Amino acid sequence: MIASLRGTVINIGLSSAVIECNGVGYEVVTTPNTLSQLVRGEEALVLTTMVVREDAMKLYGFIDNESREMFSVLQTVSGLGPRLALACESVLSPLEISQAITNADAKTLQRVPGVGKRMADRLIVELKGKVAAFAAGVVDEGGEQISLPNANIASEVVVEQVSQALVGLGFSEKQSDDAVSFVLAADPSLDTSGALRAALAKLSGK
């Protein structure tokens, strides 16, 4: 299994990036927050998990070991695949996911596009005994932090990344653009992760 990649970022797309290692380019599917921190032409270290299906093999990338472990734990829930697991981590941090599950907070879990009441209840029931380590902050003990440059990116890049992420999560282009414009007008200092969460909260009426 490919557990990590260190190499040059040669392409950044809407939901994935290509990292070249020893002349081979690997496509890594990841969250908008991670994508926003990658810089084309510069080196990055990304922790990865490979998901093998009958029709495809995909690499998923993560900022730290905690995020990677949560991705795997989420997929133990019946009916929840890698796409929805990644959507969960695009909206909520591993700590927020674990707290919502521990506190039986279905409303917080339903902030994730694709997670309705039934799936939120299923997450709470099936994972309540599996997320205590995340809440305690011990899952990534010994884990390696991703090495990414330029975490603070320009506002226009935040707008583009967040709008594209929202469209990818199922919102219309107009809904996405309006929500991003609103939250950045209220707080121009927001980074991609913060803007995405604020926009999702607005779109869900929170």
UniProtKB/Swiss-Prot annotation:
State the residue spans of region: Flexible linker.
Answer: 143-153
Q: What is this protein called?
A: Holliday junction branch migration complex subunit RuvA
Family matches, as Gene3D superfamilies: 5' to 3' exonuclease, C-terminal subdomain, DNA helicase RuvA subunit, C-terminal domain, Nucleic acid-binding proteins
Biological process GO annotation list? Answer: DNA recombination; DNA repair; SOS response
Q: Where is this region: Domain I?
A: 1-63
Q: What the record says about its domains?
A: Has three domains with a flexible linker between the domains II and III and assumes an 'L' shape. Domain III is highly mobile and contacts RuvB.
**Sequence segments annotated as region (Domain III):** 154-206
What's the source species for this entry?
A: Corynebacterium glutamicum (strain ATCC 13032 / DSM 20300 / JCM 1318 / BCRC 11384 / CCUG 27702 / LMG 3730 / NBRC 12168 / NCIMB 10025 / NRRL B-2784 / 534)
In the record, the note on similarity to other proteins reads: Belongs to the RuvA family.
Main localization category:
cytoplasm
Provide the gene name from the record. ruvA
Instruction: Summarize the protein's role.
Output: The RuvA-RuvB-RuvC complex processes Holliday junction (HJ) DNA during genetic recombination and DNA repair, while the RuvA-RuvB complex plays an important role in the rescue of blocked DNA replication forks via replication fork reversal (RFR). RuvA specifically binds to HJ cruciform DNA, conferring on it an open structure. The RuvB hexamer acts as an ATP-dependent pump, pulling dsDNA into and through the RuvAB complex. HJ branch migration allows RuvC to scan DNA until it finds its consensus sequence, where it cleaves and resolves the cruciform DNA.
Under the subunit heading, UniProt states:
Homotetramer. Forms an RuvA(8)-RuvB(12)-Holliday junction (HJ) complex. HJ DNA is sandwiched between 2 RuvA tetramers; dsDNA enters through RuvA and exits via RuvB. An RuvB hexamer assembles on each DNA strand where it exits the tetramer. Each RuvB hexamer is contacted by two RuvA subunits (via domain III) on 2 adjacent RuvB subunits; this complex drives branch migration. In the full resolvosome a probable DNA-RuvA(4)-RuvB(12)-RuvC(2) complex forms which resolves the HJ.
GO cellular component terms, alphabetically, are: cytoplasm; Holliday junction helicase complex; Holliday junction resolvase complex
Query: What start and end residues bound the annotated signal peptide?
Result: none
